[in-house]
Amino acid sequence: MLNVKEAIQDMGGADVVARLIPGATKNIVYHWSSANRVGPRFYLRFLELCSKMKVKVDPAKVMNGDKND
């Protein structure tokens, strides 16, 4: 399973993810990548996008971040 940063890269980068998630800007996606988590506002949309693009992520790590990093 990928972390948030790896998932964003796997889906084509911040530009692509920002275009595919309504309401998300490139800056927001860059923040997700650096924080390695997605906030509650876009959490479900991010998981849906990962599912559509067949990118496997751990939902708990998407919401809370990877505590080991």
Give a label for each model feature.
Residues 19:
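Alpha-helical residues within the helix-turn-helix
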Residues 2-7, 15-16, 26-31, 40-44, ...:
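Short, charged recognition helix plus adjacent turn
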